[in-house]
Amino acid sequence: MQLVHGGDWAGYRAEFGRDALDFSANVSPLGLPEGVARAITAALPTADRYPDPLCRELRAKLALHEGVPTEQILCGNGAADLIFRLVWARKPRRALVTAPTFAEYATALESVGCTVERFFLREQEDFAVTDAFCAAIRPGVDMVFLCQPNNPTGQLTALPLMEQILHRCAACGTLLVVDECFLDFLPDHALHTAKGLLGEGNLVILKAFTKLYGMAGVRLGYALSADTALLEQMQACGQPWGVSSLAQAAGLAALEETAYVEKVRALIAEQRPRLTAGLRALGLRVLDGRANYLLFQASETLGEALRQRGAVLRSCANYPGLGPGWYRTAVRTGPENEQLLKLLAEVLE
């Protein structure tokens, strides 16, 4: 079985018998917040009961956090679970995604026999989404996926352009799905979210606790949409107890971790330009992304050479629109980033 995502720490341990310095997964470098860990431990006595299938308490708290009605929220077993539920609920015949972007959109779409069209972003424009994307949206395209910021490029789509894309989708009878799982790492995230457009009706926003709160192993995400009938269909399309009681407890605790979130945002804002400068000083081409990860170009053999030295990047060779020699690295703590740069310097000598 071949895995196509980063974060395969278990595979590395099985191969090398040790843990790696993992830059392949874009999660908080500060780890699980202490308050969340305590909440999971405190919830263990409830593990003998079925979890609330509707996540009532968590959705109520998310409604206050996001400023949307409770009925416009659906929780799932990570954002990936919600992507599949959405596709299974709608069963689109034709869909549009950018290239490069997160692979699970196409994987989910193809699981229902959907024809996936790729809009190839231009390398000379640093893979930015431009208004040319609107022209690719036409009647017969049932669903459009946009990642904000895009994974793996880190590029943001300007909110006025996002609104233009949404209106084009509405005119064509198309559902727009905006993946904001990495957006909350930005201090100015409120300036880039599509939440203010939810009233349009043909919009679904995907979010996750996974990345910002370092909860990848807990699995917890949620969808926002004014189309409550669609959310009910998504609820019915998966297993009835999709979010464990421990994950619900973790989510409730995470929403109290405001100081932790500010610390993570400050760390990424400080370290991203430093890591960018360090990579460029080694002669590597680095995109000016805004996310908690960076896309850069190097030799095709770089990734494996680093693996042998105990550090793992996300090879982007399997991303349509990229190819061999493209890599994504997470932005981690200062000492970890310095260790990566040191290992890179050794490999590039």
Predicted regions and their residues:
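N-terminal "arm"/small-domain region of PLP-dependent enzymes with the aminotransferase-like
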Residues: 1-49
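PLP-dependent aminotransferase class I/II
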Residues: 31-33, 54, 202-287
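Short loop-beta-helix segment that forms the pyridoxal 5′-phosphate
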Residues: 51, 63-85
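PLP-dependent aminotransferase-like
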Residues: 88-146
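Active-site pre-lysine segment of PLP-dependent enzymes
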Residues: 110, 127-140, 152-176, 180-212
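Short beta-strands and strand-loop turn motifs
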Residues: 118-120, 143-150, 176-180, 287-288
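PLP-dependent enzyme catalytic core of the Aspartate aminotransferase-like
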Residues: 160, 308-309, 318-349
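Conserved PLP-binding catalytic core of the aspartate aminotransferase-like
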Residues: 268-269, 279-310
